[in-house]
Amino acid sequence: MPTVRLVPMTEEQYLAYRSTSDEGYAQDIASSGSMSLEDARAKSAADFARLLPDGLATENERFWTAYDAETGAEVGLIWVHFETRSEGLTAFGYDFQVLEELRRHGYGRAIMTATEDVLREQGVVSVGLNVFGDNLGARSLYEQMGFEVTSVQMRKRLT
């Protein structure tokens, strides 16, 4: 498995991320079958505006760019939300990406492992995430890494 290092995202990287993330999230929502692409685009824009009112500087949100520790090449990114709950400091991964051409080469696992290390260093007691039902590769990775299902949404088409 490759090793990665996480570096706080720069403003330039954040702006590049945001230039594609709204549409990517909308596509994920629409492909899950929960709403039309038009409605998903509206939901995506509203969600990003609500979650990131101050962009990269939004309180309790952290963005990291992942680099291959050996080559220095950029391999992906992760966006994590921090929240204090009754059990202590928790984290939720809002977005996790591996560059498309590098998928299935161990970088997903490496980014998740590096993220867990950073979160432990910061005193985080648990981390959660969402995965769309049709993303079988990600679901498999998360299960292999010890994530447990905490809720499931299901639907059945009637027409």
Task: Kindly give the residue locations of the regions a language model identified.
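Active-site-proximal flexible loops/turns
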Residues: 86, 102, 137
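Conserved active-site alpha-helix within GNAT-family acetyltransferase domains
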Residues: 109-113, 133-151, 156-158
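Short, contiguous strand/loop micro-motifs
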Residues: 56, 102, 124-126
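Conserved GNAT acetyl-CoA-binding A-motif
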Residues: 112, 120-130, 153
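Conserved acetyl-CoA-binding loop-helix of GNAT-fold acetyltransferases
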Residues: 95-98, 104-121, 140-144
